[in-house]
Structure formats: structure tokens, C-alpha cells
Amino acid sequence: MAFQKDAKSSAYSSRFQTPFRRRREGKTDYYQRKRLVTQHKAKYNTPKYRLVVRFTNKDIICQIISSTITGDVVLAAAYSHELPRYGITHGLTNWAAAYATGLLIARRTLQKLGLDETYKGVEEVEGEYELTEAVEDGPRPFKVFLDIGLQRTTTGARVFGALKGASDGGLYVPHSENRFPGWDFETEEIDPELLRSYIFGGHVSQYMEELADDDEERFSELFKGYLADDIDADSLEDIYTSAHEAIRADPAFKPTEKKFTKEQYAAESKKYRQTKLSKEERAARVAAKIAALAGQQ
């Protein structure tokens, strides 16, 4: 039987519904977004906030976002590239960095709303499962819902590190403990010690020790930055502990200091930009080339 191409009829074309642009590009799960954005009709103009967590190759992005008819509005944002200010200079995309970034966005948001003294979260981290509860005779905790986008909800994934950091920071994020590292599917219980070790970079310390014993060349290659700053496996927990304290002490955003002003950057870029010649300059350039060729003959 000869191959026959499946032709699209006029009925197919006339009834075809074009998907949303971000669905066509594979960027947005609208089934998920609809449920994260839709607010209860009896709450009228009350925004519904979500904790948006995204990962790049070199950064972790945490944002508190609400949705409006005209577009999404960002209430607060925190990035893992801000962590060097608090003492975390390496491993800015690992699980412990995700926790620290989540803690930073929580404290920054509550400070902006004036709730940082009312809801301090979990100051002594033991790896236990805790939800932020409302205080008596006070405002309710700030409620957000985790938005993971297109990421897979694998048990122990870094996105849940940011969730844990935000929850321990004082935000009310509805969740259960069955996606954190240390969850046992058979006993349906969590191992607090293992979860705590992830929060303070214990998994990195363990890998550093194992790699140093097994393959010293690979160890010196992977942890070159750590070795240059005299950071060993035993000092990681102290670094993260002091960073958490520093984040709680001053979570406010501070813009990075630029090396040059905008005018200096513009002047520098003009050095390498080819300027457009006028008609007279082009004619003079052609005449000079003709004269040079005539001189060679």
C-alpha cells in the first residue's frame, strides 16, 4: 500500500485552537498554574502569593509572586549569588545553598511586611518537620504556595531545600515531610539527622572526605576553590551556621557596587564601536586608497 500523507481538512483547520504561546514553547504548565493562581471568590481582591523557585547553572532564584490581570507582580526576590555577602562563597547551587536562599527570601519578605519580629521561624535547626503556626492576638502568618514550574518532584530535590528554608524562615508554606532527604518510604518517617546534615552541607563534607581518600587528583580539581580559601570538610557546618545567623540579622537587599558609572561604561564601549562615516569622509577614504594604489605602480 502506498504511503499517503495525512492531509489536514478545512474542518480541522477551522476548528483548531492555538495553544498559549508559553505552552507551545514548553515553558508553562497551565494545568498547574491555574490551581496556583485561582483565588477563592469570597476573598475578593486578596492576592494569592506563591513561592517561585527556579535553578540555573550558576544561580538559585526565589521570588514571592502574586498574579493580576495585567501580569504577575513580584513582592520580593532573593538569589544565591547574594550568599557570598553572608559568608557562603562556594557551592551556590547545592542543597544547602537552596535552603539558605529560601531562608533569605523568607526573612526579607517578613521584614518588608513588618512581620519579622512576630514570626521568627525555626532559629535552632534540628531537621524536624515544622509548620509556621499563627500567634495569639496577632496577625496570621504570611501564606505562600510552592511553585516549582516544570521541575520533577523527586524526593530530596533541591527545590524542597528552598521550601524548607522558607518555612524555617517564618513563612507559612503548606507542605508535608515526604519529599525531604531522609524520608523512609517503608516506615513513612523522616530522619531528622540526615535532613539537618543536608541543611548544613553535611552531604558535601562527606563527599569531600570520601573523594580525598579515593582520588586525590579529582578532589583537588573539583574542590579547587575550597582549597584555595582553606575550607575543609569539618568547617562547612560552621560556615552555614554563621551564614544563617547573618541572614537573620540583616536580610535586606543591598545592590552590588559597580566598578564604573553608566557614563564610563558608555565611553568604554564607544572605543570598540565602529562609527558611521559621512559622505565626505567616505570620498576622502576612496581617494586615499586610489592614490596608494597609483603610488605602488
Curated annotation (Swiss-Prot):
Domain of life: Eukaryota
Coiled-coil region: none
Gene3D superfamilies noted in UniProt: 3.30.420.100
Matches recorded under InterPro entries: Rbsml_uL18_euk (IPR005485), Ribosomal_uL18_C_euk (IPR025607)
Keywords attached to this entry: Cytoplasm, Isopeptide bond, Nucleus, Phosphoprotein, Ribonucleoprotein, Ribosomal protein, RNA-binding, rRNA-binding, Ubl conjugation
Phosphoserine modifications at: S167, S176, S235
Keyword Repeat: no
The keyword Secreted belongs to this UniProt entry's keyword annotation: no
A cellular component annotation (GO) from this entry: cytosol
GO molecular function list: 5S rRNA binding; structural constituent of ribosome
Compartments in which it is found: Cytoplasm; Nucleus
Cross-link (Glycyl lysine isopeptide (Lys-Gly) (interchain with G-Cter in ubiquitin)): K164
UniProt record, GO biological process: cytoplasmic translation; ribosomal large subunit assembly
Pfam families, per the entry: Ribosomal_L18_c, Ribosomal_L5e
Assembly mode: Component of the large ribosomal subunit (LSU). Mature yeast ribosomes consist of a small (40S) and a large (60S) subunit. The 40S small subunit contains 1 molecule of ribosomal RNA (18S rRNA) and 33 different proteins (encoded by 57 genes). The large 60S subunit contains 3 rRNA molecules (25S, 5.8S and 5S rRNA) and 46 different proteins (encoded by 81 genes). Component of a hexameric 5S RNP precursor complex, composed of 5S RNA, RRS1, RPF2, RPL5, RPL11A/RPL11B and SYO1; this complex acts as a precursor for ribosome assembly.
PANTHER family: LARGE RIBOSOMAL SUBUNIT PROTEIN UL18, RIBOSOMAL PROTEIN L5-RELATED
The family this protein is said to belong to: Belongs to the universal ribosomal protein uL18 family.
Function in brief: Component of the ribosome, a large ribonucleoprotein complex responsible for the synthesis of proteins in the cell. The small ribosomal subunit (SSU) binds messenger RNAs (mRNAs) and translates the encoded message by selecting cognate aminoacyl-transfer RNA (tRNA) molecules. The large subunit (LSU) contains the ribosomal catalytic site termed the peptidyl transferase center (PTC), which catalyzes the formation of peptide bonds, thereby polymerizing the amino acids delivered by tRNAs into a polypeptide chain.
Protein name: Large ribosomal subunit protein uL18
Organism encoding this protein: Saccharomyces cerevisiae (strain ATCC 204508 / S288c)
